[in-house]
């Protein structure tokens, strides 16, 4: 398994697809690892050089002591792409991964060909909400909040104990290191990218899920309206993590958008 020490942290990462094709980076959400993208990547890897990674404190990446800042996650991604020799890429980000993508594009606009911002916003939640969540997971563990989180992630139909995928992704959430989860909650709590995201000037696709309880469609739509010429699409019958519930729709939207942007 590929690991790299970059920016003072060991990151787990993987490349797939075709190294001779344009680079496409995926950044995942809070409480997940890069396996959430598997079904999407399967549909796109013939066209792109895919880069997947577990952000700091998630998956098999090192969980450094919390709290984290969003700038830490952006610097981690920058250093990883430097390590891999990726000078320019399209970046797909989900939730906090979308915030990382926004921050990376604002800091390094010359390195980003296009952005896909899925189920995210420049500002997510309130300080009180994130402080309450940090306290809950620190005192009682992630399992204590898992059911409430998963109600926002997935549709009622998906959230069945008879659905092995649901059971598996619940395990992914609850096995996330508390340090990484709480640290990244602090990063989201303290981040407000409104002004830098408003200033973006590149092809941007914003995706919402009609049953998303974490970043509702209207929040994603508001982000799209503030970005110059950004596109906005809603995926039906999905919650906060459409790459799991509707990977076909996500891959189709990404593929068409990047083709229209003349990338890949």
Over which residues does each language-model region extend?
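Catalytic active-site module of serine/aspartate enzymes centered on a nucleophile-bearing elbow/loop
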Residues: 230-264
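Short beta-strand/loop motif that positions the catalytic acidic residue
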Residues: 200, 206-208
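Conserved alpha/beta-hydrolase "nucleophile elbow" surrounding the catalytic nucleophile
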Residues: 28-30, 89, 93-95, 209
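Conserved HGGG/HGGXW glycine-rich cap/lid loop of the alpha/beta-hydrolase fold
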Residues: 9-63
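Conserved alpha/beta-hydrolase catalytic His-Asp/Glu region
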Residues: 125-128, 139-198
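Flexible "cap/lid" loop of the alpha/beta hydrolase fold
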Residues: 99-107, 111-146
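Acidic catalytic loop of the alpha/beta-hydrolase fold
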Residues: 210-215
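Active-site loop/oxyanion-hole signature of alpha/beta-hydrolase fold enzymes
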Residues: 38-45, 51-92, 252, 256
């Amino acid at each position: 398994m590929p690991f790299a020490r970059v920016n003072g942290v060991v990151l787990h990462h993987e490349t797939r697809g075709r190294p001779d094709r344009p680079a496409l980076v995926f950044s995942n959400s809070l409480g997940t690892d890069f396996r959430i993208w598997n079904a999407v990547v399967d549909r796109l890897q013939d066209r792109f050089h895919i880069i997947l990674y577990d952000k700091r404190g998630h998956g098999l990446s090192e969980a450094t002591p919390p709290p984290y800042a969003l700038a830490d996650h952006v610097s981690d991604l920058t250093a990883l792409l430097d390590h891999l020799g990726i000078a320019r890429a399209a970046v797909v980000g989900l939730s906090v991964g979308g915030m990382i993508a926004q921050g990376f594009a604002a800091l390094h606009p010359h390195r980003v060909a296009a952005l896909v911002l899925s189920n995210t916003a420049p500002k997510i939640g309130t300080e009180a909400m994130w402080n309450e969540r940090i306290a809950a997971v620190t005192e009682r563990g992630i399992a204590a909040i898992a059911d409430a989180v998963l109600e926002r992630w997935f549709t009622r139909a998906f959230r069945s104990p008879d659905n092995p995928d649901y059971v598996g992704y619940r395990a992914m959430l609850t096995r996330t290191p508390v340090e990484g989860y709480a640290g990244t909650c602090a990063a989201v709590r303290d981040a407000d990218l409104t002004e830098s995201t408003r200033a973006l000037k590149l092809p941007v696709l914003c995706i919402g899920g009609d049953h998303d309880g974490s970043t509702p469609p209207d929040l994603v739509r508001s982000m799209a309206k503030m970005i110059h010429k950004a596109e906005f699409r809603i995926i039906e019958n999905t919650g906060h993590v459409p790459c799991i519930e509707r990977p076909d729709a996500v891959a189709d939207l990404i593929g068409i958008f990047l083709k229209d942007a003349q990338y890949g």
